[in-house]
Amino acid sequence: SNLPVCDYPANPYVGCSHACRYCYASFMKRFSGHDEPWGQFVDVKRWKPLKNARKYDGKQVFVGSVCDPYMPEEAEYGRTRALLEELVGSGMEVSIQTKSDLVLRDIDLISQLPGARVGFSINTLDEGFRSDMDAAVPLARRLAAMKELHDAGIRTTCFISPIFPGITDVPAIIEAARDRCNLVWLENLNLRGGFKADILGYIAEKRPELVPLYDAIYQKGDRTYWRELDVEVRAYAEREGLEYVRDDDTVRSPFDAPPVIVNYFFHEEIKKSAKKEGGHA
């Protein structure tokens, strides 16, 4: 994923029962000792109590970088809640990423974490496509949970990811979420590893008219679609009076201001360029 850099990733579980077909975290399976396919196992983490949490004051922690911290198992085991209880009073800036409205259970703790924000992954408004891709809660529940958190004064992010070319309607999702979020993150679909063939097979079966587009992007490396979508979303933002930036997660607008749209389409190119420049230094 092209998620913004944080000081500490935190994942209360190994594995994720949401079983997203495009999950970049599936590489974690090889470290798990499991034979089951990714998405069909979950290991519950236990850890020693955090000592002197205040020493992390000012650091950023991202909860849910390679698992969903509010997958159904959390209702039983409560490891994410246990983590948040330890972080209250630490001074850490906490970001949570989820596809579940179970996060609402922990509003009492999240509201005690200054600067906390909760992101919801939404890459379609089509419930049929959503159910083909993940086993998380329906989209309406995600949007409702986003609103409840935002209404409670907690910063929220609509994470439009992964954007499926020809399928994900970015402006439509922004319209559905703009009254209940502070940030909109945009991340393109990256196909790598074992799930590339699965996703391309799905497109061939369910959306054959898109096969030439997917071949151009994912077999030939053509970036035209993303450049054109960048122009389209920028024009939409200008029409709607929304701030639009690339690869910059530092924007802090007033809570009641319209959401800032952050485009991460070109994050990998920027990282490669930085490495190249660094190599010549």
Annotate the PLM regions.
Residues 1-117, 125-128, 139-143, 150-151:
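Conserved Radical SAM active-site core
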Residues 66-68, 99-101, 121-125, 161-163, ...:
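Active-site beta-loop-alpha junctions enriched in small/polar residues
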Residues 69-71, 127-135, 155-161, 220:
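Surface-exposed cleft-lining segments at the edges of enzyme active sites
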Residues 171-281:
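Auxiliary Fe-S-binding modules of radical SAM enzymes
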